């Protein structure tokens, strides 16, 4: 449909929608620009996407230079007195025996990354001196070599290397900044008795300078210059002209692709092809029918999308378009309550505390080693708490700000797309019908259907009971529970901050959705009091209908399996069935029987009767052997 047709269909709202998308894009660009500046200022730019994409341009020439350096050391082909970098390289070759390719990659990548980190820290001139950068490269190489040597050290002790590497990688990945990653690795190695390589700063300076020399010769990225710092003339590094321009272009490209997806104020554009649908203007960027991030590389995506062109996706389009056409409004009762909770410091209704956790007081100078250890342990705990708090608080605040932004509209909509499995998802993430408890509680349907009788209130009551944690009793009992607590429900709706029964009874799982139910149920009771019955009451509260282990529901339905069907609530039953409890009970019975009557583990044997071993040299247990049960 053309611009003119959309304008004729939606009038001024279409213009407003385009303006909203344009503003959202500007906000996304500004946010990314600040993020990129922060990364550079904190000395983390060398590990990012831009650095990786630029390093590959001169990878081969730099790698060739480093290879020659490694071979020179390996063949001991150096005349006269050897510099200290030579002996450090010998250490590295010993550690990376039979892994020279890995070592050469490490030298190139670490060298470039550290140089870029230092040179783009624009506010710190001392970080650009040759000696500072050289030492930084030496330190980074030592850290990598220490980890590799630590693994070798642990292997000689018979450690489970697969678990060790996995746990180290996971713990390092969980830490945000490189300094925290390094601190963790060093502490972990020290605890296991590994002391590390004995490299001096002087030697690391010389090694780093040699790596810099090789990288300058292999690329136009950096140049050596003399700079006046304080009263001295000092050798410094600067980025070359090509590198500076290339970095700027890459940043500009990233920023131009930045986008923030928000709800729309008119029905989203209907999907008509894998690339046409959802938004109308600036938010169309990075929006497509199918989420293909999981496929990885560009070629895989191209292959997949070319095959999509040959498939009839009419049913997919129709499904998504129907979901997109569903109008919502902001639940202002919930929004106002959440704003009050947030303004008063949080810690209610799933809103995290808004004030930072207090840091520990400094230890006295005469603190014992045990007190220092305990202090560090507590400090780490507080740091983790604070990081989690900030993350939750930010997510909550973004949802509130988005809801405030759209509270004035009489209808809002959510563009949807699907993942590669065909599962449907709303594209906006700050606020959506598939979000967390707070996000869901902030949304009402814009249109409702009047109830025909008192019987129609049944599912509203069941929904309320479910949110309060009473979802395992019969429907009749759930309805009775709601009716017995009508006074509590009304009091909660009238004074949510003063009368916190709604929060206590929801057991912390769905507090805000339960409060949204309280608001709706109070309106229902007011209608009944005024009209004598529920007929004509219009409810717009979304009611949750969740599947029970939906994969097994599909299997049970396809196989006409009555036992499985009952366990996953496909067959009518007075009480809700819990497949997980059913399976757990059966397994527990087998485990008790095995403990009392079972045999020792049986092991797999080959045709010669010898016990087969796994990759770690342990006997392979005969899984599924009936004698075990």
Please state what every model-predicted region is.
Residues 1-628:
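Non-catalytic nucleic-acid-binding interfaces of large nucleic-acid enzymes and RNP effectors
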């Amino acid at each position: 449909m053309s611009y003119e047709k959309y304008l004729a269909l939606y009038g001024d709202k279409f213009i407003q929608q385009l303006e909203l998308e344009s503003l959202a894009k500007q906000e996304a660009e500004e946010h990314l620009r600040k993020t990129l500046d922060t990364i550079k200022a904190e000395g983390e730019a060398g590990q990012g996407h831009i650095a990786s994409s630029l390093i590959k341009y001169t990878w081969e020439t730099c790698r060739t230079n480093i290879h020659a350096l490694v071979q020179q050391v390996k063949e001991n082909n150096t005349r006269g007195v050897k510099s200290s970098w030579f002996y450090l390289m010998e250490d590295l070759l010993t550690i990376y025996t039979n892994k020279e390719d890995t070592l050469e990659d490490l030298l190139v990548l670490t060298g470039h990354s550290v140089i870029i980190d230092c040179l783009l820290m624009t506010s710190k001139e001392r970080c650009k001196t040759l000696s500072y950068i050289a030492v930084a490269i030496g330190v980074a190489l030592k850290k990598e070599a220490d980890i590799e040597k630590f693994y070798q050290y642990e292997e000689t002790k018979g450690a489970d290397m697969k678990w060790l590497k996995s746990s180290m990688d996971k713990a390092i990945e969980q830490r945000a900044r490189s300094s925290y990653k390094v601190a963790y690795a060093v502490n972990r190695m020290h605890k296991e008795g590994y002391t590390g390589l004995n490299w001096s700063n002087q030697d690391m300076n010389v090694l780093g300078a040699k790596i810099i020399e090789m990288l300058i010769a292999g690329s136009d990225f950096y140049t050596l210059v003399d700079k006046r710092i304080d009263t001295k003339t000092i050798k410094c590094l600067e980025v070359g002209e090509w590198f500076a321009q290339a970095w700027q272009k890459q940043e500009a490209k990233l920023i131009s692709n930045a986008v923030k997806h928000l709800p729309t104020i008119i029905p989203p554009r209907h999907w008509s092809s894998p690339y046409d649908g959802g938004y109308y203007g600036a938010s169309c960027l990075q929006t497509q029918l199918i989420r293909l991030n999981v496929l990885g590389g560009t070629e895989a995506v191209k292959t997949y999308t070319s095959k999509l062109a040959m498939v009839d996706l009419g049913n997919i389009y129709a499904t998504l378009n129907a979901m997109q056409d569903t109008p919502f409004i902001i639940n202002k009762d919930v929004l106002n309550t959440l704003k009050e909770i947030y303004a008063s410091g949080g810690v209610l209704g799933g809103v995290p505390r808004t004030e930072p956790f207090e840091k520990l007081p400094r230890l006295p100078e005469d603190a014992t080693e045990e007190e220092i250890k305990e202090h560090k342990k507590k400090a780490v705990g507080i740091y983790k708490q604070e990081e989690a708090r900030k993350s939750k608080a930010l997510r909550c605040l973004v949802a509130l700000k988005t809801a405030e932004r759209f509270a004035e509209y009489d209808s809002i909509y959510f563009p949807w797309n699907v993942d590669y499995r065909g599962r449907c998802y709303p594209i906006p993430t700050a606020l959506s019908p598939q979000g967390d408890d707070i996000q869901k509680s902030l949304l009402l349907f814009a249109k409702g259907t009047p109830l025909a009788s008192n019987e129609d209130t049944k599912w509203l009551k069941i929904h309320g009971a479910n949110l309060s944690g009473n979802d395992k009793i019969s429907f009749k009992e759930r309805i009775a529970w709601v009716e017995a607590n009508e006074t509590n429900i009304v009091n909660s709706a009238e004074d949510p901050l003063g009368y916190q029964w709604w929060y206590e009874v929801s057991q912390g799982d769905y507090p805000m959705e339960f409060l949204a139910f309280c608001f709706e149920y109070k309106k229902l009771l007011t209608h009944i009091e005024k009209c004598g019955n529920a007929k004509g009451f219009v409810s717009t509260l979304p009611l949750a209908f969740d599947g029970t282990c939906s994969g097994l529901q599909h299997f049970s339905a396809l196989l006409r399996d009555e036992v499985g069907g009952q366990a996953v609530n496909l067959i009518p039953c007075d009480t809700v069935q819990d497949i997980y409890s059913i399976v757990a009970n059966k397994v527990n019975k087998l485990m008790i029987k095995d403990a009392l009557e079972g045999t020792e583990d049986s092991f797999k044997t080959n045709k010669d009767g010898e016990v087969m071993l796994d990759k770690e040299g342990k006997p392979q247990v005969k899984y599924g052997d009936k004698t075990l049960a």
